[in-house]
């Protein structure tokens, strides 16, 4: 099984790093909101717009993959997520954060969609279950 995962190691490492980054961002956000004395409603809105962004992103995935391909789409989504994270660190306005969280939701779900689509496309039927099993272990360990 480990030999079957060899070609997928970079994608699995990327998934691990992305999920760890999302976990850190989701943990730091409430702490920053508390430091800014933001209300519970603002915290709820920030969470809501993130998942709204994920819903929007699912509608864009097919178009993005068809237009750009897996490698370019993944690189663009990870870069855009990084830019949003850096902007959130520089700007201390929860209302601006809502726009950034909306965008991060879109970019995150698109990156996940690209990874899973690529794993599905690149793996043969005989090892697909093992590949996706390893992917899910990596995602849940992060």
Predicted regions and their residues:
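Helix-to-loop junctions at the C-terminal end of transmembrane segments
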Residues: 57-69
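Helix-breaking motifs and short loop linkers at transmembrane-helix boundaries and internal kinks
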Residues: 69, 90-92
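MFS-fold secondary transporters
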Residues: 84-88, 104
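Paired small-residue
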Residues: 95-103
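Intracellular juxtamembrane helix-capping segments at the cytosolic ends
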Residues: 110-123
């Amino acid at each position: 099984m480990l030999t079957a995962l060899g070609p997928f190691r970079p994608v699995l490492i990327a998934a691990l790093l992305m999920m760890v980054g999302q976990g850190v961002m989701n943990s730091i956000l409430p702490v920053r909101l508390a430091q800014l004395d933001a209300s519970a409603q603002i915290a709820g809105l920030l969470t809501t717009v993130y998942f709204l962004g994920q819903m929007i992103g699912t509608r864009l995935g097919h178009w993005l993959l068809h237009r750009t391909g897996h490698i370019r789409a993944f690189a663009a989504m990870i870069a855009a997520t990084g830019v949003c994270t850096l902007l959130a660190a520089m700007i201390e306005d929860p209302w601006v954060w809502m726009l950034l969280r909306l965008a991060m939701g879109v970019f995150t779900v698109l990156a996940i969609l690209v990874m899973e689509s690529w794993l599905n496309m690149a793996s043969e039927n005989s090892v697909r279950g093992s590949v996706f099993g390893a992917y899910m272990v990596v995602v849940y360990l992060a």
